[in-house]
Amino acid sequence: MEKGMEFLPVSREEMIDRGWYYYDFLVVTADGYIDHPSFGTTLIARLLESRGYRVAILPQPDWHSAEDFRAMGKPRYGVLIGGGNLDSMVAHYTVAKRRRTRDLYSEGGEMGKRPDRPTIVYANRVREAWPDVPIVIGGLEASLRRFAHYDYWDDKVRRSILFDAPADLLVYGMGESATAEIARRLARKAPPSELTDIPGTAYITDQVGELKFHRADAPGYEAVCADKAAYARATKIEYDEHDPIRGCAVVQPCEGRYLVVNPPARPLRREELDALYALLYTRQVHPMYKNGIPAIEEVQFSITHNRGCFGGCNFCALAFHQGRMVTSRSIESVLEEAELLTREPGFKGYIHDVGGPSANFRHTSCQKQKRCGMCKNRSCLAPEPCPNLDADHSEYTELLRRMREIPGIKRVFVRSGIRYDYMLQDKDRSFFKELVKYHISGQLKVAPEHCVSSVLDYMGKPHFDVFLKFWRQYQKLNEEGGTEQYLVPYLMSSHPGCTLSDAVELAEFLHKNGRTPEQVQDFYPTPGTLSTCMYYTGINPRDMSEVYVARDPKEKAMQRALLQWSRPEKRALVVEALEETGRTDLIGYEKKCLIRPRKGEPYGQPPVKPERPERPERQPRRKKEASGNRGRRGTPTAKPLAQKGKMSPRKKAAFAKKRNGK
């Protein structure tokens, strides 16, 4: 491996091989070490390395003691801790709270390589190992738990993760600019207690003095535990102030102290993103993992070209993590990475994805937000697109065109989420046409999620007629191009606001259109989303209105079964759901029916077969006549015999030609 392309050291032996007798920062991660820009830990570590710091990685340490944390010695400036690319509780448990059997971010997919809530566990072990070292926590797990939050797995409200993880600072969001500033100040020996004015960070204080930012007060931990309406109000404040331009510092009291969450850091500019992705990554799994790490398979030949999402889905945590303001890399930066992939071992000519949170976003949704920030209480796309929406795919189309022309690349696919509602707003159909023609590998996955308008409003999704319009145009483009490509809709059951009757309506639509989804996602209440707030409180934080919530496991199972009505093992639940909703008319033999009744069930009668008319008595056979043409059963044919001496005009003409020698 060429100089400058080594993995970062993961042991004291590797530090010695580099000639290091000290190092500056220890980066602890709950994932196995993959040196690829799709992993946040790697991005942060390589960024610090590019700033001249010596950085070591400690992936998935043994958390039962502090020995692994001491193994490389004490870092000069601090320890940075991340809980992994995926929330650890989602990685470990299904929505039914059953333990998963496979962890894609660990060697060989083996479970048990990290604890539940590793950010808390690791921080406590680091504090045990080195009581005076500065500790900074970050990543998705910490970011979504920066405020007091409802924890689905414990079924209770937990305080901010900063009160459980003995860290000095929390970095939320993507974190590059905040981490770089923290590192700069720690290297200058600034005490962590003075690092209170950095955007994109949170800290705990005994007294809230004068703040650098405008202040917004949220209901405290005790209040949100005791009153669900207070929890909903706190959630709205947290979302409203999550803006790098107009956002305030949010202060939340907790057990006699105060959590202060500064406004988000501004998104990286295009040139900063380009520089970040141009750093030297090996793009490989560390060789210490003999059985590999499955997570590399999805991203090894994929490219991230954007950040942020203004889609506004209430059940998605990305907006609360990356923010709603979209930024993207330059075309040249993305093409350079594509050319790099063509030289990678194992590359077979296929770019698996050119995407991000939403693949077809390349710029902010409107020019106004660059000056004023994102709008409060409004979504750019749902339920109706904003009049100021700037829907333009021209740059993305150019990017994909130029990538297709790179020598060594056979196909370029787009597999990240496509926002079809945004695509339909673009008057230029070039991107849609080229997407269908060049960038789909047999099927396109989109996320309408449901078909009932009230449910879609709670989800923050566009109404279903938008999906139907897209579906028709997609089919038309495939017909015109002579291609047979399928549309795979993602669907969700049991989202707050979705009743059993709503699930029946969705099942009817799927049945009518010949759709039998293989996979259905139950709503998963993860920290930091508006939908999770609705699930816990039964209140929509946007307007404080009451929301129906399916909490009973039996009802959730029935909603899921309705969307998979054709599976034999789901039949009993489907029957029970149809009985409960008074829709037993969907059990029967009519075309509209979801399932047929079984013998002895009091539903629908089989269609009555029409009685066959009695056959007329057979007539005795007549004796065969001496002459005349006869049909199959001896009856005369309709064509009469030709009269003797007569000749048809056609035969007359033929005879005349023969006679005249022609």
Describe the residue ranges of each PLM region.
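Glycine-rich beta-alpha loop elements in corrinoid/cobalamin-binding modules
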Residues: 14, 32, 40, 59-255, ...
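Conserved SAM/AdoMet-binding glycine-rich loop
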Residues: 27, 43, 62-63, 340-488, ...
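N-terminal pre-triad scaffold of radical SAM enzymes
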Residues: 30-31, 289-317, 350
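Terminal amphipathic helices with adjacent charged low-complexity linkers/tails
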Residues: 64, 193-242, 256, 265-268, ...
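Flexible glycine/acidic-rich beta-alpha junction loops that bind and position SAM and/or redox cofactors
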Residues: 87-96, 144-146, 176-181, 205-210, ...
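Amphipathic alpha-helical packing elements
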Residues: 161-173, 561-605
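Conserved, mostly hydrophobic/aromatic
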Residues: 168, 276, 313, 334, ...
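Intrinsically disordered, Lys/Arg-rich low-complexity segments
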Residues: 608-662
